[in-house]
Amino acid sequence: MRRTGPEEEACGVWLDAAALKRRKVQTHLIKPGTKMLTLLPGERKANIYFTQRRAPSTGIHQRSIASFFTLQPGKTNGSDQKSVSSHTESQINKESKKNATQLDHLIPGLAHDCMASPLATSTTADIQEAGLSPQSLQTSGHHRMKTPFSTELSLLQPDTPDCAGDSHTPLAFSFTEDLESSCLLDRKEEKGDSARKWEWLHESKKNYQSMEKHTKLPGDKCCQPLGKTKLERKVSAKENRQAPVLLQTYRESWNGENIESVKQSRSPVSVFSWDNEKNDKDSWSQLFTEDSQGQRVIAHNTRAPFQDVTNNWNWDLGPFPNSPWAQCQEDGPTQNLKPDLLFTQDSEGNQVIRHQF
């Protein structure tokens, strides 16, 4: 007999076939090149493949990042990739042509003196994108020194026909208006400067003519007949005879005054030198004194204030002998120079100099 009970109990896991059929099983693996997107329920998955072409097709130049990526809505075929790349390249070519036509319509409207060269800051890649050929660049290089404006205009004219609708864009219109207004302002300033210069020259000429008139006037006054000048000379000769006598008397009086002033100025100098010697002796007498044994010692006059004796040029009388200031100075040093104030006795009875702190 078969024993099914213990074997079924040993497994412990019961599998329902109907539940397994209902569950969805992932049959295909996720490719590493696909991009995972979080989709809401009801949305479809977008099959976007970011694959880079290793070998680009001949005759197609890679100009943008969009040429690296191809959008594959359905099947992945070589024909689909070519169609997508050609579509992106055609869009890029259209944009470059539009830019070239806008430049072609903008530049003829500008003034000749305010135009700046657009090719001065452009690179070779930008020129190639604009549809310019290298031959036209070479011709512009040869004729740049002679006629730069005409060659640059010829360079910026593309092979495509002109679009009348693009030339009247608001951006281009405002750009040309701003440039024209700036050019008009520059011209007005130049005219104003030239007018100022003309006025300045006109005024300088007037001033020069007026100066010439003023210089000619004194010359006309001096031109007088000879008869009058002779008469005036005779009269002036009589006056000149009396003039030397007056000059001599004036000179003598002036010399006498100078001699007296010199004599008066010399006398105080000698007095001043004698007073200086006396002041020196008085200053020595104030600095030094004699002790009880007759020896010369330094005089310590601590109680008396400091006095500037050198500036007092007359010690006996002073500049004002009757003034109280001179009397105080005469009495001051004699009263302060006393032996009791200068000397004292120590513990052994010896006489020593008094030190007051």
Curated annotation (Swiss-Prot):
Its main location: nucleus. It is found in: Nucleus; Chromosome; Cytoplasm, Cytoskeleton, Microtubule organizing center, Centrosome; Cytoplasm, Cytoskeleton, Spindle pole. Belongs to the AUNIP family. InterPro entries: AUNIP (IPR029286). Pfam families: AIB. GO terms for biological process: double-strand break repair via homologous recombination; negative regulation of double-strand break repair via nonhomologous end joining; spindle organization. Expressed in heart, skeletal muscles, placenta and testis. Interacts (via C-terminus) with AURKA (via C-terminus). Interacts (via N-terminus) with NIN; this interaction blocks NIN phosphorylation by both AURKA and GSK3B. Identified in a complex with NIN and AURKA. Interacts with RBBP8/CtIP. This is Aurora kinase A- and ninein-interacting protein. The lineage of its organism: Eukaryota, Metazoa, Chordata, Craniata, Vertebrata. The modification Phosphoserine is found at S267, S292. Residues 71-98 are annotated as: Disordered. Induction: Overexpressed in brain tumors.
